[in-house]
Amino acid sequence: MWAMPNSSQLNQQNTSQSAEWFERATKVTPGGVNSPVRAFGSVGGQARVIARGEGSRLWDIDGNEYVDLVSSYGPMIHGNAHPAIVEAVQKAAADGLSFGAPTEGETLLAEHIVKRTAVEQVRLVNSGTEATMSAVRLARGFTGRAKVLKFEGCYHGHVDALLASAGSGVATFALPDSPGVTGASAADTIVVPYNDLDAVREAFAAHPGEIACIIAEAAAGNMGTVAPEEGFNAALKEIAHADGALLILDEVMTGFRTSYKGWFGVDGVAGDLVTFGKVVSGGLPAAAFGGRADVMASLAPSGPVYQAGTLSGNPVAMASGLASLELANAELYPRLQDNADRLTGLITEALSAAGVEHYIQRAETMFSIRFAEGQGRNFADMQAADTWRFAPFFHALLEGGVYVPPSAFETWFVSDALTDNDFEVIEAALKPAAQAAASAQRPQ
């Protein structure tokens, strides 16, 4: 449950045009949005309709300006409208938007992913959901098995079989699963607590020779931010292989965000299959999955496991993604770490001064705030926090010109575009935000 801010905390900015356009949107779009978290459902108040972004800033259609700490939920690692990415997109678009045929850009982007990670072959798709859906299908086809093991609070896109205990998307609405996901769809999905190797071993013992794969976020970012405990991902791979199953590591969020090599660069664990998105897209609809060459060889047209897409490998998206990855050189990541350290330091200082119990959940450059004492290690821990403090905290930041994810269960993302002036704006907004969190009342 969340404590909704009182009326004095909501919409002190002029948001009349956002309200008008949002009302217009609700007439033609369910809930007025095309992804639920954008509706401000868990924090209340008027969702902002964004007009443009540049560097570290966003502007809504009413002219309100914000420091951007959402980064489009991860892709905008270089900030908004980076000139090199914009130029690459414009050049590619001028040559044609889509051909339904092979292009050079597909191979260039795939080569770049292979060069920086442990995957040997790559298939390009349009979204993270497509990537995880296809990776699971491939794992089932390769192993000849049906069951999939996933973790509570880990989100792998809106795939029916993976929406059980799926974290932020459904947690925002306090729904354990999505209506429309049938029992048959989820019947082969086994769900266990995150960071619990004993539960994983018990699941394999209960279903010997039946589990096709384990799928896990390389570091969880959809129950808030929860890093895997030391050795967790390596143990998952060992357990899976001992039973003839595969390990799928979902790096849609962590890939090329947490290090030059993604989470693989942090713990050195190579998934048999790995999914990528967000940063790899540069902000356009693109994603990928890849892995061991022998596994990928089962994918059509080389093998019998079917996967296809009219717009997969779209040349404009390939240009955007390649430009994004080329900018994300090894020198970028220490700067991102510095920005994350500086930001979390300011948050801790403000919340501590206001007497608010909290813990900063970190996974390298990704983080979230747990409004409780101590670190959360799984979804139950994150749900047990004082999440009702988040909505007043969020709105005070928004009024102070700082745009953060509108859910206690979403991860915050820094960009390389943040400036000293941005941190001054953030610091000024954090004091009233911390006070708002401190004065929040637990819902009855």
Curated annotation (Swiss-Prot):
* Gene3D superfamilies listed in its UniProt record: Aspartate Aminotransferase, domain 1, Type I PLP-dependent aspartate aminotransferase-like (Major domain)
Q: Name one GO cellular component term.
A: cytoplasm
> What reaction gets catalysed by this protein?
(S)-4-amino-5-oxopentanoate = 5-aminolevulinate
Q: Do you know which Pfam families this protein is assigned to? A: Aminotran_3
Q: Its pathway?
A: Porphyrin-containing compound metabolism; protoporphyrin-IX biosynthesis; 5-aminolevulinate from L-glutamyl-tRNA(Glu): step 2/2
Record-level Gene Ontology MF annotations: glutamate-1-semialdehyde 2,1-aminomutase activity; pyridoxal phosphate binding; transaminase activity
Give the record's keywords alphabetically: Cytoplasm, Isomerase, Porphyrin biosynthesis, Pyridoxal phosphate
Q: Where in the cell is it found?
A: Cytoplasm
**Per its UniProt record, what InterPro entries does this chain match?**
4pyrrol_synth_GluAld_NH2Trfase, Aminotrans_3, Aminotrans_3_PPA_site, PyrdxlP-dep_Trfase, PyrdxlP-dep_Trfase_major, PyrdxlP-dep_Trfase_small
> Where are residues bearing N6-(pyridoxal phosphate)lysine located in the sequence?
278
- CDD domains documented for this protein: OAT_like
What the record says about family reads: Belongs to the class-III pyridoxal-phosphate-dependent aminotransferase family. HemL subfamily.
Q: How does it assemble?
A: Homodimer.
Q: What is this protein called?
A: Glutamate-1-semialdehyde 2,1-aminomutase
Give the species.
Corynebacterium aurimucosum (strain ATCC 700975 / DSM 44827 / CIP 107346 / CN-1)
